[in-house]
Amino acid sequence: MREMKDSGLKWIGQIPNGWEVNRIKYLFKTAKGLSVTKDNLIEDGLPVISYGQIHSKINTGVTVADELRRFVSCDYRKYVSSKLEKFDFAFADTSEDYEGCGNCVYKRTDDELYGGYHVVILHSIKKEDNRYFAYLFQTDAWREQIRTKASGVKVFSVTQKIINEASVIIPPVEMQARISNFLDAKCTEIDSLTADIQKQI
């Protein structure tokens, strides 16, 4: 039987020996997205993703679907801190509902993409596969840390500080890969079944 230890976190309780606990701020560097609005959008140019797309129903949170990309002038390319590199995350910093607090996208690829309006970017410090965190960030248990601290009445605000202070549980790298590969395969299987059902309708 696997030996367990207390994580010190209310939302998870015990974790296996060999797993670690850390805060987001020690794993990522935060930055703001571009100060652009709908008025700045054009047909083609520099790809951006803003909070509206992050809250989209087609956003899985674990990759960036092509349909979520919008475009602004290439003049914005000079704002390098707003650029999403491979293994980075983009969180929406506002949400109209409690459930949307913590919504994000994970950038798995090398293609060019910038964070847009109302976006907090997490730049990966180690610059390595963060699929495990992408899946962790989708769980209600993890998001409870964000939701309980988000402020607002009609619109909830999710600040860089709130995200930075959130804790994560970290398995060894090989276990992260096993978890991520398993979930990737399951999600692909579900997507395939969903597509088949839609064809039959």
Task: Identify the residue ranges that each predicted region occupies.
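Non-catalytic DNA-recognition/assembly elements of restriction-modification systems
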Residues: 2-38, 165, 169, 173-177, ...
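Sequence-specific dsDNA recognition surfaces
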Residues: 7-8, 25-40, 52-89
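A short glycine-rich beta-alpha junction/loop motif
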Residues: 4-7, 38, 112-119, 128-131, ...
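Short amphipathic beta-strand starts and helix->beta connectors
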Residues: 105-106, 149-152
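Periplasmic-binding protein-like
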Residues: 142-145
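A short beta-sheet element
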Residues: 50, 75-138, 157-159
